[in-house]
Amino acid sequence: GLLGRVKGDRYCLLEEGGYLQGSLEIIKNKFAFVDGPEFSVFVPRSKFNTATHGDEVLVKITEDKDGKKKEGEVVKVVKRGSNRVIGIFERSKNFGFVVPTHSFGKDIYIPNKFCVDVPNKKLVVVEVDFWGDAERKPEGRIIDILGDPFDTNVMIEALIERDGLSEEFNMEVKREVKALREMTEEEIKEKRDLRHLPIVTIDGDDAKDLDDAVYVEKFPNGNYKLLVSIADVSHYVKSGSALDKEAYLRGNSVYLVDRVIPMFPRELSNGLCSLNPNENKATFTCEMIFDENGKLIDHDVYKSVIKTAERMTYTNVNKVLAGDTEMTERYANVKDMFFTMLELSKILRKIKRKRGSIDFDLPEIKVI
């Protein structure tokens, strides 16, 4: 456990002293939870003190029901997640203040010299210089004006700023990307060549990074071969490289309602690693053989090179399966495979449901 200083040179385990340490997650600016590996503590808005979303905090447990439902108050900010806060600017006669939209709930005092030209009621970014105490309010400087707080694009920009996201990459990463090249013939020879197969990608209409592709074949004995190929990013991103380190820091791509904050530069995610039609692409392939009842009887995983035959969308695949004349003619080279896919998918779905699987048919939100 974690040690904390109690008094003078005396220490105790924080948990035994009624304290816990974890990351503060503020929900709708009304309450928060401090989460650790084996606990979750509810914190009411009035008990945030100077803590803000993403801070590592120390909480004192004020209520503990049956050891499960804990409630507490923030007594110390151990480490700031960020020194920036998003809020709405309010002007007074000789100064201004910012009302945080997703933070500790205390207004931030802005000296007049830092807000002379800032429009009233706009969403702004504040860099906090002083986090406040029992006598003084937090104080800071406005470093960016985002715009109308009710504008969708502005709200998305605020979200990006709040969570420390960035669409930009550092120069070292950009240099590495610029030096990357398509696969050579020698590199292709080291992989299993699947370019003769009519493999397809199936994605949404707006997808840019096509990272997986499929192929299905039915044998005369009733067995099915299913190939699932995913982009082999490791062909281009080597361990310990600037790209590798940046991807580790980002963790994943972030999908917002109107854009994607990529884990890799777009030259890689939408270019070299995107399984675009009629281009040689490095992939990992899982090859599976199912019998007529959907039982997996064999499988293999290997590095491969593919050349997708078509960039399909869910809409167009459904049109082919529905017998749409235009789509059937357009995709005559792969239409029969879609019916084989449908056949196998029904068999596998039946097995999934027997195992208790649940399908969530959730709508996709899009800004129009």
Write out the residue ranges for each language-model feature.
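Electropositive polyanion-binding surfaces
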Residues: 120, 125, 130-132, 172-368
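S1/OB-fold single-stranded RNA-binding interface
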Residues: 1-201, 205-213, 219, 223-227
